[in-house]
Each structure stands twice: as C-alpha cells, then as structure tokens.
C-alpha cells in the first residue's frame, strides 16, 4: 500500500501595472495590483498484486483539491484610492475551490515472449463552482513482437487537460494601450482527449505510426475583434472539439563513422469546430506536413569534435480562426569534448536564416488581423564539466503548469 499526502502552495503578486490611454472618447487611467495564491492538496492510495501466470493487477484512488485565492484591484494613480465598478473597471476577488476524485483499476498480462497486454479504466468526478461532471478514461496497450527487432504496438489512450487557474477568473487585463483586452472565462472546463494509435518498429530503428485523436472541449486562447467596441478581446474558450489524423515515419541512417542522421516526416489532417464562437461559428479543416532532420558529423575522434546540424519545416496550418503560415528553422552547433570527455565546450547558432518565428493572421468573416513578429538569430556558448561520477538525484518536479 502507498498512502501519500502532498501539499503545494504558490503565491505570485504583481504590483503597479500602470496604464494611461485615450482612445476616441474613452480614457483609461489606472494602475493594477493582482495576486494569485494557490493551496493544493493531493491524496492517493495505490495497490499492486502479482497473480501469477503473467497476470498483474493494480488499482487505486486519487483525490485532489485546491483553493484559489486570487484578486485584481484597480487604483487611481494620483490618489492611490481603489477604483469602483462605477468607474467602468471591474475589481475581482475570488475564492474558488476545485475538487477531483479519480478511481482506477487495471491489469497486465504477458502471453509468452511475443504478446503483452495492459489495460485500465479510470472514472473521474470533477467539481467546481460551475461544473459537476463524471468522465471515463480508458487505456489499452497491446504489444506484439513477431520476431526480434520487429514490434507492432496498438494503443487506446485518454487524458484530461485542465485550464490555468488564472484563465477561469472573471478578470480583465489591458495591453496595447487599452486596445487589447485579456478576459478570463469562469465557464472554462477541462478538455478530454482520446487517441487511437498504431506503431510499427522495423529492425529496432525504423518507426512508422498512424493515429487519430478527438479532443472534446478543446481550449485555446483566441482573438476576437469586437463588433460593439473598438477593442480586440483575447479569451480562452472551449471549442466543440478538435480532431487530428496523422501518419509519421522516422528513418535513421549512417554513413560509415562520420555521419549519423535521422529524418522524421509527419502528415496531418486537422479539424477544429466551435458552433458558438462569439457571433461567427466555424468548422475549419486543414492538411499540412512537418519535416525534421537531425545530422551529427564526426569531424574528428582525437580530438573529439562533432558538428550538429538540425532543420525543421512546417507547412501552413490553422488554430481556431488563425491562419498559421509556413515556418522552419536551421540550427548548427560545434561540440568539443576533452579531459576524458568530462569537459564539453559547445558553440551554437540557432535559427540561422531567421525564419523560425511565425506571424499568424486572421481573414475570417468579420475578422481581419495582421501580425508581424520579428525573427532573431541566436549565438551562444556553453561549457559543461562532470566532476567524478556525480549523478544528479532525481526529484519529482513541482507541477506549476496551471499557475500564472
């Protein structure tokens, strides 16, 4: 039996964010103070049994609860007094509780040396001041090895992606001189992803995959130009769903002892649908491709000198009502190892041709947005030295993915 309690607390406060702005007949003159404090507890029980004849059983329960104490206040920059809602600015103070119960059970079974199966099913209850729902999450993995070096894998997986804590607060922030507003969304719910995937490994090095996934309530921050005011609104919304079907091939190759390369090719069909996206619902589809190549050239073994060249290209894609242009980059690095390989000197240049940063745009119904973001070539040097046989202790990292 494993009984555990984990408690996490995080607090982050930002003070004195000042804005003076006049746009048409509207004037914004304030500074803000906002703070996020999260108290989170996690309890879990887990048990495993070996039943013999290749059968193993596991089950358990996980309970997670968090309390989000956050606020955002507006102040007069001259008097320092707190502004009220009558000043067209909304102060926000929240005490939001979230609870999740997850109960699961699974098994694994080996059928000789060629076939192995593991499966599990989790039922989860998610409760917030807005949502109270039950969901099911199945996982099935089947591995078949007809001969050494050849492996066929079939898998059904499922997962949940929770929104950031600050994204569900009923708060409004201003950027771009007040023309751009960042809106919270108290109605956000977790996204649920289900994926079916098949992978074939040939000669222990060539990898071929095909998959289909469906993400219900997929969420992402989107941009909308208001039809009522001269502002653009950034807000994280739940779409009806996102779907992807894809194929992938990963092919390594070597040229004697001086070149070691890997080419990865990906083809995707992508769909996103939202029937209540403001006043402009959408159902968009796009096919695109990705190619990536990693090359390591051994210039010399004595001294140990290697040159690494990597390249990446991504054809046109979509995200919500955004159109994402073609992008790519080429990186290069020169590595020198010495002192019996305890010391490594690395010189590198990233995004040589300054093509890595995309400038997404919107041309959809009433929306017309053009962005231009600059690309920068990066040069750097790093030095690493290993003292004796020191190995860094493995520690579980604190999950801060949902914090502001």
Label each region the model flagged.
Residues 1-16:
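Single conserved hydrophobic/aromatic residue that forms the stacking wall/gate
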Residues 40-42, 92, 189, 195, ...:
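Outer membrane beta-barrel strand-and-loop segments of large Gram-negative receptors
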Residues 63-69, 121-129, 156-162, 204, ...:
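Transmembrane beta-strands of outer-membrane beta-barrel pores
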Residues 30-118, 143, 271-298:
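Outer-membrane beta-barrel transmembrane domain signature of Gram-negative proteins
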Residues 96, 160-209, 214, 232-246, ...:
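Outer-membrane beta-barrel signature, preferentially recognizing the C-terminal barrel domain
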Residues 54-57, 113-117, 149-152, 204-208, ...:
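Repeated loop/turn-to-beta-strand initiation elements of outer-membrane beta-barrel proteins
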Residues 285-404:
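Conserved C-terminal beta-signal and adjacent last beta-strands/turns
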Residues 97-145, 258-269, 290-315:
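Surface-exposed extracellular loop regions of Gram-negative outer-membrane beta-barrel proteins
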């Amino acid at each position: 039996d494993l009984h555990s309690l984990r408690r996490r607390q995080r607090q982050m406060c930002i003070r004195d964010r000042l804005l003076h702005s006049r746009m048409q007949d509207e004037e914004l003159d304030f500074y803000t103070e906002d703070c996020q404090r999260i108290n989170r507890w996690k309890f879990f029980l887990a048990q495993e049994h070996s039943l013999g004849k290749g059968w193993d059983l596991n089950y358990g329960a996980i309970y997670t609860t968090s309390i989000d104490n956050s606020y955002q206040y507006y102040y007069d920059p001259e008097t320092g007094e707190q502004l009220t809602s009558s000043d067209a600015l909304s102060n926000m103070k929240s005490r939001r509780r979230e609870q999740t119960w997850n109960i699961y059970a699974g098994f694994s079974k080996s059928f000789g040396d060629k076939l192995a199966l593991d499966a599990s099913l989790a039922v989860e209850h998610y409760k917030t001041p807005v949502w109270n729902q039950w969901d099911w999450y199945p996982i099935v993995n089947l591995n078949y090895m007809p001969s050494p070096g050849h492996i066929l894998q079939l898998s059904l997986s499922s997962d949940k992606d929770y929104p950031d804590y600050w994204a569900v607060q009923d708060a409004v922030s201003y950027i771009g001189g007040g023309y751009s507003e960042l809106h919270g969304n108290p109605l956000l719910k977790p996204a649920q992803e289900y994926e079916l995937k098949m992978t074939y490994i040939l000669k222990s090095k060539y990898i071929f995959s095909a998959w289909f996934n469906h993400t219900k309530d997929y969420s992402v921050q989107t941009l909308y130009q208001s039809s009522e005011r001269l502002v653009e609104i950034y807000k994280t919304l739940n779409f009806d769903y996102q779907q992807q079907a894809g194929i992938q091939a990963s092919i390594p190759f070597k040229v004697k002892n001086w070149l070691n390369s890997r080419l990865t090719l990906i083809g995707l069909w992508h769909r996103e649908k939202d029937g209540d996206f403001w006043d402009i619902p959408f159902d968009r589809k796009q096919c695109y491709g990705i190619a990536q190549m990693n090359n390591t050239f051994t210039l010399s073994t004595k001294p140990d000198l290697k040159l690494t060249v990597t390249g990446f290209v991504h054809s046109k894609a979509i995200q919500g009502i955004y159109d994402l242009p073609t992008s790519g980059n080429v990186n290069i690095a020169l590595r020198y190892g010495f002192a019996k390989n305890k010391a490594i000197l690395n010189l590198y240049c990233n995004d040589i041709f300054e093509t890595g940063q995309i400038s997404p745009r919107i041309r959809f119904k009433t929306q017309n947005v053009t962005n231009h973001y600059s690309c920068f070539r990066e040069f750097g040097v790093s030095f690493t030295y290993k003292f004796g046989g020191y190995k860094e202790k493995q520690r579980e990292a604190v999950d801060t993915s949902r914090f502001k």
